[in-house]
């Protein structure tokens, strides 16, 4: 889609200077580079560029959350993890052998973005990855709704852009549910935790409505699946009785905390509950979402097409897809 847009854009612009030597090779029928990352039987891989990229601005796009891709290790089929995608990204950069004029990485879901701070003896994987890409010659890193954009402090002299999609969320939601009334009496924005506060504050300021938030009480004495389990969600905010509620966050991982927040809002007599999240990972599947939709705890789940989404999701009655590029 990006390639088609560039081809169309350059076909319809600067027609009057096509003979200028400054615009040699400016127009082309294809801007995609033929590349691959084949693997050996042991699972090891290599990056291969099948055409020259010398002197070009190279843009590498990667979806580190696309688990639908597989490879074989000693006869066993493995699904690709974010670590595998990140390694392939570095392989393609290495295959360029420093010949590209500039290397730009477009990574919609920032690799390891949730591991952006240290609270105990643990690795700072996101900062480490950014430093590694910078050391390999990457000029710009483009991402969307980074979990914490301040992680760019790891590479203060390099380009780092994190684009947020609040306008696209509102446009998609208001088109899907046109009877939403954006005023203080009928709508409220809720942050599911303290980390998403800045998103909720922006939404509420733009719409001119009130905001509430939940904070998580955790059991710090135990670790389950790499994190301290949530004991309860406590709500801070005005009365939600009869109001439609929009819950905003950067991602749905398992969805457990998001669904618990939606349930608590309905128990507080909220009207309809809409979930807006940039990345729908759905790591525990859709059974719980189906159940909560049937019980009326959630009405819509709006997520972007910035990461891979399984085909079964498109059949869900509560699902609303947000296109961050021109829709087909």
State the predicted function of each range.
Residues 16-53, 112-122, 161-174, 181-185, ...:
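Short, glycine/charge-rich flexible loops or terminal/linker lids adjacent to PRPP-binding catalytic cores
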Residues 57, 101-104, 139-140, 186, ...:
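Residues at the starts of beta-strands that form the adenosine-phosphate
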Residues 36-41, 76-94, 120-128:
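Glycine-rich anion/phosphate-binding loops
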Residues 323-328:
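Conserved small/polar residues in nucleotide/adenosyl-binding loops
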Residues 109, 216, 222-225, 263-297, ...:
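A short, conserved beta-to-alpha structural element at the edge of catalytic cores
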Residues 119-181:
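Anion-binding alpha/beta catalytic cores of soluble intermediary-metabolism enzymes, centered on
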Residues 55-58, 62-64, 68-72, 90-116, ...:
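Mobile, glycine- and charge-enriched loop segments
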Residues 146-149, 196, 304-309:
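Short, polar loop motifs at secondary-structure junctions
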